């Protein structure tokens, strides 16, 4: 269920995405083991009941939107899959960061609003500033606003050095107080760089070559988006404002999932995702069950209690 520290470092050469941040305070302090990979920077972790709002930019089929919305719903322990291993069980690893920080507060996510921007109102080539502009269409308080861009939308840095980003922005003034909201952006890489952002469902653009795996929801682009979204959600929870848990430079850090790139199951090594579960009917590879009978492939998370990459299978 885990990968050694040596393997963890070895996998850094195939990291698929960078992330970006802002800042905020936290009252709880942490006592870290000497061998802890991810350093705690005394900042805030995301806590409380948080709505996850989806802003769809460009054309997505209803079936594609359902893959992502079902994933968000699956994160909640109040609506867990009846089959193990589950998405909710995968998400529980993030709770260990709160325990390590001696925080009595916890995080509860639920699916909020979905906003469709199908008319490409900002064009088909977006800057990071425009991503934040789109993210502001979601809730402004106690929220993670996720911008998902369609396969025909280019975003600054997409496919060059990132598959998505996360950060925070000041929201509207509510009752005289300005709140921050967390945001995530993830792009559909299917027609632009599936080998970079949707591996292992597509042949990698570099490194060891192996046959691509069958995507669990039969959509290479969106199943790849779920992998990157899962990684960024874990980073958002544990390093929402740039001063939580991370290692390295603040503007390009290793976080809870990006510290374990390319690892999805035990036995993983560069070019091989690990010994995954395989659907006997479809041949699809996966490692987590979700709501509505969904199956997903989710990245390993760095477990601060064991200093290893933790996987579900």
Curated annotation (Swiss-Prot):
The keyword Cell cycle does not apply. InterPro entries: EXORDIUM-like. It is found in: Secreted; Secreted, Extracellular space; Secreted, Extracellular space, Apoplast. Its main location: secreted. One of its GO terms (cellular component) is apoplast. It comes from the Eukaryota. Induction: Induced by phosphate. Residues 1-22 form the signal peptide. Coiled coil: none annotated. Glycans are attached at residue 119. Keywords: Apoplast, Glycoprotein, Secreted, Signal. Pfam families: Phi_1 (PF04674). The keyword Signal applies. Belongs to the EXORDIUM family. PANTHER family: PROTEIN EXORDIUM-LIKE 5, PROTEIN EXORDIUM-RELATED. May be involved in the regulation of cell division. This is Protein PHOSPHATE-INDUCED 1. The lineage of its organism: Eukaryota, Viridiplantae, Streptophyta, Embryophyta, Tracheophyta.
């Amino acid at each position: 269920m885990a990968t050694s520290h040596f393997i963890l470092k070895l996998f850094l050469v195939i990291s698929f995405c960078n992330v970006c941040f802002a800042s905020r305070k936290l009252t709880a302090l942490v006592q870290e083991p000497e061998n802890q990979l991810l350093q705690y920077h005394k900042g805030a972790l995301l806590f409380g009941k948080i709505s996850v709002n989806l802003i769809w930019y460009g054309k997505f089929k209803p079936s594609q939107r359902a893959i992502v919305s079902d994933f968000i719903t699956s994160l909640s322990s109040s609506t867990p899959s009846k089959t193990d291993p589950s998405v909710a069980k995968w998400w529980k690893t993030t709770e260990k960061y709160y325990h390590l920080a001696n925080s009595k507060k916890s995080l509860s996510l639920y699916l909020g609003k979905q906003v469709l921007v199908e008319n490409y109102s900002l064009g088909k080539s977006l800057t990071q500033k425009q991503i934040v502009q789109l993210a502001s269409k979601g809730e402004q308080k106690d929220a993670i606003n996720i911008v998902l861009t369609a396969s025909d939308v280019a975003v600054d840095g997409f496919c060059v050095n990132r598959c998505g980003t996360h950060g925070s922005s000041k929201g509207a003034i509510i009752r005289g107080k300005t709140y921050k909201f967390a945001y995530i952006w993830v792009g559909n890489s299917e027609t632009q760089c599936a080998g970079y952002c949707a591996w292992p469902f597509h042949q990698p653009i570099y490194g060891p070559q192996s046959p691509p795996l069958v995507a669990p929801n039969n959509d290479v682009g969106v199943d790849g988006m779920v992998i990157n979204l899962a990684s960024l959600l874990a980073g958002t929870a544990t390093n929402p404002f740039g001063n939580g848990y991370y290692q390295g430079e603040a503007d390009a850090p290793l976080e809870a999932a990006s510290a374990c790139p390319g690892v999805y199951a035990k036995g993983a090594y560069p070019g091989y995702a690990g010994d995954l579960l395989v659907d006997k009917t479809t041949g699809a590879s996966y490692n987590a069950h979700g709501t509505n009978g969904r199956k997903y492939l989710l990245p390993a998370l760095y477990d601060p209690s064991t200093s290893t990459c933790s996987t579900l299978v």
